[in-house]
Amino acid sequence: MNSNITLASTSLPTSGQLGSVIVGSVITNGTLFTSGTPLSISNVTITPGVWILLGQVVFTIASVSTSPVLIGHAISLGQSNTAMALLCSNEDIVSETVALSNVISKQVTRILAVNGTYTYNLMALNTFSNCTISVNAPASNLTALRIA
């Protein structure tokens, strides 16, 4: 069973066709969060059809001072690039002590049927004190897969 398989075609579906994948643009690596302020991480523009949106935000504790605490974190998918959306979200109230270089990741998934062309945004929000938090852009993304 361990043999190579040659596909008849090496081309991927054209953007917007069934099976097409769109990988969203991502903000600059190391961008700092402001506590309590939403940050736009990535966005994709999708066309009519049924899509799975897969979002991931990875962030790192970039610096700490006395008693650093991550109070809560959340990510969301929606059409706004300035506010957290109710379309789909993943939230945690943690109130945990953090250390320098701690890495935290959150994921969100949504299946959408759309009848027009829309841009969806992956937003992140962190509430923290006595530390700074930065985006790990190479590991953060928003991807859309057309399934129908």
Regions found by a protein language model. Name each.
Residues 1-148:
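Extracellular jelly-roll beta-sandwich "head" domains, especially the C-terminal globular C1q domain
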